[in-house]
Amino acid sequence: MAGLAPEGSQFDARQYDAKMTELLGTEQEEFFTSYDEVYDSFDAMGLQENLLRGIYAYGFEKPSAIQQRGIVPFCKGLDVIQQAQSGTGKTATFCSGVLQQLDYSLVECQALVLAPTRELAQQIEKVMRALGDYLGVKVHACVGGTSVREDQRILQSGVHVVVGTPGRVFDMLRRQSLRPDHIKMFVLDEADEMLSRGFKDQIYDIFQLLPPKIQVGVFSATMPPEALEITRKFMSKPVRILVKRDDVTLEGIKQFYVNVDKEEWKLETLCDLYETLAITQSVIFVNTRRKVDWLTDKMRSRDHTVSATHGDMDQNTRDIIMREFRSGSSRVLITTDLLARGIDVQQVSLVINYDLPTQPENYLHRIGRSGRFGRKGVAINFVTKDDERMLFDIQKFYNVVIEELPANVADLL
């Protein structure tokens, strides 16, 4: 799993603007729609109740920068170009926009999402299905290397959303197994990657088969000229949303992963670690409030002194718990991402990601604190089979290598 992490593509806003000016000349002002509203909570976005339930159940508590600016314009039916590194929560941005606008009483394909690889398409399908869990959404991934007949059967039985790779999607449209008549949203994810893999012609071919009035969303880490060309051809007055990466570093923090075969075995792994290590103070991150309570009970029943905070507690209670943790009267704090940015505790030498974060950018906010004030720190990530993709994405996003936990971990703390 660990191995050299690929270089993250850096984004240069000046270069982008220069290319835009070259391509659009004086039309640039008219080409974009300006949209400056920022929503700092999901509740403020006017989303359906059952979509909000899905978002919170998935483990999101507070929208990331791109979600704060990108979900609402997409929900309003505007064309959007969103430029952000992978891992900034862009998948959930367009999934929320799509799920908000579907007519669930019509079991026809209303949204088509294209991705460059099979793995990414399947990952998007998973997120779409999880966020739409309480809405009863029907999603299907059309990707190469799977049974054509099975695809045809599922499409004919009716789905709301198709996520897929260009080759298989075009094939399904050509065979008329995927009927485009009701498609009203078209999303290109990792557009730069799709174009660099030579899918340009196929994307154009697919677009020709879609209804003329369609909402288009383009999501990409970089904007090569070909991507701009696509935006010109397919989009009308798109909203441009640009999110830069945080300038926080992971320097001085040693990062490891532990393979855990099953979710149920994480607890044993955690207790083993606490028995073998002399830890001054540590923070354990999980993805849901319910899990905070569950893990706190389990740890206490095994005689570990732990405190816990999460978003359901009132501010006063959270402040008291944080004071106790800072003063050292409790050594282990169990919490969720909501509080990741606010834990300024100098003695924290170890951060454990009991659950990997749901988006790579939160990884930094979680573990970036264990090396605060120049102190060295250690981060240990529990990784099940289902987490391997996220671990890879985190390594790619930060251009780091996360090694397997060595036997002599006690010497590092």
From Swiss-Prot:
GO cellular component, one term: cytoplasmic stress granule
Functional note: ATP-dependent RNA helicase which is a subunit of the eIF4F complex involved in cap recognition and is required for mRNA binding to ribosome. In the current model of translation initiation, eIF4A unwinds RNA secondary structures in the 5'-UTR of mRNAs which is necessary to allow efficient binding of the small ribosomal subunit, and subsequent scanning for the initiator codon.
PANTHER family given in the database record: ATP-DEPENDENT RNA HELICASE DBP3
GO biological process: cytoplasmic translational initiation
Family: Belongs to the DEAD box helicase family. eIF4A subfamily.
Residue sites binding ATP per the record: A84, Q85, S86, G87, T88, G89, K90, T91
Domain Helicase C-terminal residues, every copy: 252-413
Superkingdom of source: Eukaryota
Record motif Q motif, residues: 40-68
Organism: Nicotiana tabacum
Positions of short motif DEAD box: 189-192
Keywords recorded for this protein, A-Z: ATP-binding, Helicase, Hydrolase, Initiation factor, Nucleotide-binding, Protein biosynthesis, RNA-binding
Catalytic activity reported: ATP + H2O = ADP + phosphate + H(+)
Ranges of residues in domain Helicase ATP-binding: 71-241
Name used for this protein in its record: Eukaryotic initiation factor 4A-14
Family matches, as Gene3D superfamilies: P-loop containing nucleotide triphosphate hydrolases (3.40.50.300)
